[in-house]
Structures are given as structure tokens and as C-alpha cells.
């Protein structure tokens, strides 16, 4: 689907304010006249809060913790869907087969998580792979990819472009801990096998999607 955009949004967007979320809605409505949109939402603070509660009351199973994260991401997806309907399919997509059918009939499909043990980064890459899309736009909590955590290391080097192989090497050295870790190895594996480019841009700058569509690079390009 050459006219399809796959867009991943960090859950941190939903921890901010309604005005920023509204800006995304306006952009998606504008783009839907020219493109089909597959949007993947993270769980954000809601997921962290409820996973924290679950642990405090004795839940230790990763399955249940992951399910709480998935449902949190789907609630964020519902927020977007409610503001994008009827352009958007009226509920979060549950699997890739369903997504393929929906994209034939709707301009916009929104997903949270899909299955336990899978990050939203991996979901975004699987969506792109299933739809035959060669690029994922990733609204992240960071402005660029760095060789190490820029909040801890003032000499951290930013990348305008970085290969999947190089980024995998950095991730395996565990130099991107905690909040800074922007993508997981499984997502990179999917991107590599299907030759998908990932473009990182900051979630507080929603208009950068127009720069990306003009061929500009507002953040970091992760290439196969």
C-alpha cells in the first residue's frame, strides 16, 4: 500500500495535555485525505500506573502485566478513534489479518498492543511489514538517536542517520537504559528483514510529519 503511512506514537503523548493531542487529530484528519493511516499508540503513564498497582498487590505474572499494558495502549487508541471517527475504524485493531481487511474500507486504523510480550515498536514494524510499507514514522520521547543516554552523558553523540546494525550494537551494549531506550531488538530484526526505514522524531513536534513527507529529516533515520 504505497499511499499508506504507518505512524507510531509514544504513550507519553497521552500524559501531556489535550491541546497537543488535538493537534495530532487535526494533522491526521488532514493527511487522511491523501493517505491511509495506520496509527500505533503506546500505553504511557496509564500503563505504568496500573502495572505499578498490579505489582503492589502481588501480580508477578508477566502475562498479566503485559495485558494491562496492552489495554492501556488500547484506551489511548480509543481516544484517537473517538475523535477521528467516521474516518477511523470504530475500535482498536486486534490483529494483522483484521488490519488488512479494515484498511480496504477505512482511511484510518488505530492499534494499541496486540499480544503479550510485544512492544509497540514491534507492533509498528509488523504493521508496516504486513501492509508492505517501507517506512515507519516514530514519534518518540527523544529528538534523535544517541550513542548513549544524553541525560547522563553530556558527550553523547547524536545521529542524523544510523544503520540498524550499528543501533543493534549500541542496544546490545545496554548503553540506552530505562526511559531512553527507544526501540527493541525484535523491532530492528523486523525492519532489517523487510528493509523498513524508521524515522525518529520528537512527539512534542507533531508537524514534523510534513517535513518527513517532503523528504526532510527532522530527527534520525534508522536504515536497513
Curated annotation (Swiss-Prot):
ATP binds at residues 8-12, 44, 48, 140, 146, 149. Inhibited by UTP. Pathway: Pyrimidine metabolism; CTP biosynthesis via de novo pathway; UDP from UMP (UMPK route): step 1/1. It comes from the Archaea. GO terms for cellular component: cytoplasm. Catalyzes the reversible phosphorylation of UMP to UDP. The keyword Kinase applies. This is Uridylate kinase. Disulfide bonds: none annotated. Keywords: ATP-binding, Cytoplasm, Kinase, Nucleotide-binding, Pyrimidine biosynthesis, Transferase. It is found in: Cytoplasm. Homohexamer. Belongs to the UMP kinase family. Its main location: cytoplasm. It catalyses: UMP + ATP = UDP + ADP. It comes from Staphylothermus marinus (strain ATCC 43588 / DSM 3639 / JCM 9404 / F1). GO terms for molecular function: ATP binding; UMP kinase activity. The lineage of its organism: Archaea, Thermoproteota, Thermoprotei, Desulfurococcales, Desulfurococcaceae.
Amino acid at each position: 500500500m504505497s499511499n499508506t503511512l504507518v505512524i507510531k506514537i509514544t504513550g507519553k503523548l497521552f500524559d501531556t495535555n489535550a491541546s497537543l493531542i488535538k493537534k495530532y487529530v487535526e494533522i491526521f484528519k488532514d493527511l487522511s485525505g491523501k493517505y491511509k493511516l495506520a496509527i500505533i499508540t503506546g500505553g504511557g503513564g496509564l500503563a505504568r500506573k496500573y502495572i505499578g498497582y498490579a505489582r503492589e498487590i502481588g501480580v508477578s505474572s508477566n502475562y498479566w502485566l503485559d495485558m494491562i499494558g496492552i489495554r492501556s495502549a488500547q484506551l489511548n487508541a480509543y481516544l484517537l478513534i473517538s475523535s477521528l471517527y467516521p474516518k477511523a475504524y470504530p475500535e482498536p485493531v486486534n490483529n494483522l489479518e483484521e488490519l488488512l481487511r479494515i484498511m480496504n474500507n477505512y482511511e484510518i486504523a488505530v492499534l494499541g498492543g496486540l499480544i503479550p510480550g510485544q512492544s509497540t515498536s514491534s507492533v509498528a514494524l509488523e504493521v508496516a511489514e504486513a501492509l508492505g510499507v517501507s517506512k515507519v514514522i516514530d514519534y518518540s520521547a527523544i529528538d534523535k538517536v544517541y550513542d548513549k543516554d544524553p541525560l547522563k552523558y553530556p558527550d553523547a553523540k547524536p545521529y542524523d542517520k544510523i544503520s540498524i546494525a550499528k543501533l543493534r550494537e549500541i542496544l546490545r551494549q545496554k548503553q540506552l537504559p530505562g526511559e531512553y531506550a527507544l526501540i527493541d531488538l525484535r523491532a530492528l530484526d523486523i525492519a532489517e528483514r523487510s528493509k523498513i526505514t524508521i524515522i525518529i522524531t520528537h512527539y512534542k513536534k507533531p508537524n514534523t510529519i510534513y517535513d518527513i513527507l517532503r523528504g526532510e529529516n527532522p530527527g534520525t533515520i534508522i536504515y536497513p
